[in-house]
From Swiss-Prot:
GO terms for biological process: proteolysis involved in protein catabolic process. Allosterically activated by HslU binding. This is ATP-dependent protease subunit HslV. A double ring-shaped homohexamer of HslV is capped on each side by a ring-shaped HslU homohexamer. The assembly of the HslU/HslV complex is dependent on binding of ATP. Its EC number is 3.4.25.2. Na(+) binds at residues 164, 167, 170.
Amino acid sequence: MSFKGTTVIAIKKNGKTVVAADGQVTFGHTVLKSNAIKIRKLLNGKILAGFAGSTSDAITLFEKFEEKIKAKGDGLIDIKRAAVDLAKDWRSDKILHKLEAMMLVADSNNILLISGTGDVVEPEEDVISIGSGGNYAYSAALAYMENKKLSAFEVALRSLKIAARVCIYTNSNIVLEEIENE
């Protein structure tokens, strides 16, 4: 799956987790909006989520993801279990299967990529990125992560700025959300 029109990155560093995205929305070769918000706080700010792809599909998936977490009913938040459950439904459900988006979700301990092909990926490094500029942002973030002085916020911001310079579907109107790690 390849989605043009965005870059989303998740980073965990020095006790903080950040999810950030650019604001560009494109339709074909036209920029429709430059300040869209593609990240959300879920469960009263305990989980961060970002998406690449169709906005309405992503909102549906955010809602389904929250339902999966709440379905446990024990008050514990297990984003890994919820991600696997969502990926299974997304792949097998006739309606969900048609949704075109990818998601990054993060809590204070985990960063995950969830796709409609049934993939749930926990990155080897504390960095993962999706969207048309994802590879550029990911590469930049890996390099910036080596700088001990940079925070997760700064790594995400700088990495997305690099992606915006290289990817025509990514801009530098960046929105970042951050949570403290436990």
